[in-house]
Amino acid sequence: MAKQDYYEILGVSKTAEEREIRKAYKRLAMKYHPDRNQGDKEAEAKFKEIKEAYEVLTDSQKRAAYDQYGHAAFEQGGMGGGGFGGGADFSDIFGDVFGDIFGGGRGRQRAARGADLRYNMELTLEEAVRGVTKEIRIPTLEECDVCHGSGAKPGTQPQTCPTCHGSGQVQMRQGFFAVQQTCPHCQGRGTLIKDPCNKCHGHGRVERSKTLSVKIPAGVDTGDRIRLAGEGEAGEHGAPAGDLYVQVQVKQHPIFEREGNNLYCEVPINFAMAALGGEIEVPTLDGRVKLKVPGETQTGKLFRMRGKGVKSVRGGAQGDLLCRVVVETPVGLNEKQKQLLQELQESFGGPTGEHNSPRSKSFFDGVKKFFDDLTR
């Protein structure tokens, strides 16, 4: 039976670039992958055709030979009759396409390093500014304490793979070419576990929860990340463990807002204090301190208290506390208070008194000029 053209199998033109071929391969491989078509022999056969076409058309030498001689270029040694061995190496195929998803890859595979873990830690502003030590509990994979990560039953050892003789690779003949592929027997590790550990069933790792004490340095902020080396999941078969990353999130504070190493807060004062000046108490993270408010203070004025902010997590200068004054309009006035305010307003020369309310005069002068310009 004549073999189908490789370009037709992938649905690309004979002038297709490599990226087009890879894109077509990914789409078709996902569609016909055996895991998605279990028990479907036609899909498995189609999948093998797709792999065969892909391996030829993405190799410049093989593609040139195929374009010149067609399938005859690979008949000696036979792609179809043993060139790829009995059955497709699915993990190796998807090592090219999806990387770590299926764990494939060329050549002997080293035991995989343990996965990194992430823990989201919420802190109060006070904890973030001063630093704190917290205990956390995380689910993870730890090295099996029976086989000590080897995966083999105590008293036994992993055996050298008889197919690849420990290299993790097998050589396949494809017409004019000899190529190396991941050993399908040991999946590239070079060893096999004949007598698996009864506790971890040959994986070398077991699921556990562990408690860690995490020291948070003073000055951290939302988005900062603390790395605990080697506290991630244990690696496979004795490989190094991954790391644990603690992601910091600082809760909103009822009084202070943080911007870099500076803190901001709003301080309400009554209009008499704003006009006459005086002394008030304002909060800081270290307690209350006194602040002198000069007379004629307007809403929005910022008072800087140096060194009352946050010390940089990287060392160096400490930030400041900036207090923004908000002048409050009095509410709930009794008749006497209203009368006094009325007399005060009259003493100003009305609502827009020029001398006592310079900003009001400036505003209304601007409004008058605006309308005068419109009527010209």
Curated annotation (Swiss-Prot):
Residues 5-70 form the J domain. GO terms for biological process: chaperone cofactor-dependent protein refolding; DNA replication; protein refolding; response to heat. CXXCXGXG motif repeats lie at residues 144-151, 161-168, 183-190, 197-204. Its cofactor is Zn(2+). Homodimer. It comes from Shigella flexneri serotype 5b (strain 8401). The gene is dnaJ. Zn(2+) 2 binds at residues 161, 164, 183, 186. It is found in: Cytoplasm. One of its GO terms (molecular function) is unfolded protein binding. This is Chaperone protein DnaJ. InterPro entries: DnaJ, DnaJ_C, DnaJ_domain, DnaJ_domain_CS, HSP40/DnaJ_pept-bd, HSP_DnaJ_Cys-rich_dom, HSP_DnaJ_Cys-rich_dom_sf, J_dom_sf. A zinc finger (CR-type) spans 131-209. Keywords: Chaperone, Cytoplasm, DNA replication, Metal-binding, Repeat, Stress response, Zinc, Zinc-finger. The J domain is necessary and sufficient to stimulate DnaK ATPase activity. Zinc center 1 plays an important role in the autonomous, DnaK-independent chaperone activity of DnaJ. Zinc center 2 is essential for interaction with DnaK and for DnaJ activity. Pfam families: DnaJ (PF00226), DnaJ_C (PF01556), DnaJ_CXXCXGXG (PF00684). PROSITE patterns: DNAJ_1, DNAJ_2, ZF_CR. GO terms for cellular component: cytoplasm. Zn(2+) 1 binds at residues 144, 147, 197, 200. Belongs to the DnaJ family. Participates actively in the response to hyperosmotic and heat shock by preventing the aggregation of stress-denatured proteins and by disaggregating proteins, also in an autonomous, DnaK-independent fashion. Unfolded proteins bind initially to DnaJ; upon interaction with the DnaJ-bound protein, DnaK hydrolyzes its bound ATP, resulting in the formation of a stable complex. GrpE releases ADP from DnaK; ATP binding to DnaK triggers the release of the substrate protein, thus completing the reaction cycle. Binds 2 Zn(2+) ions per monomer.
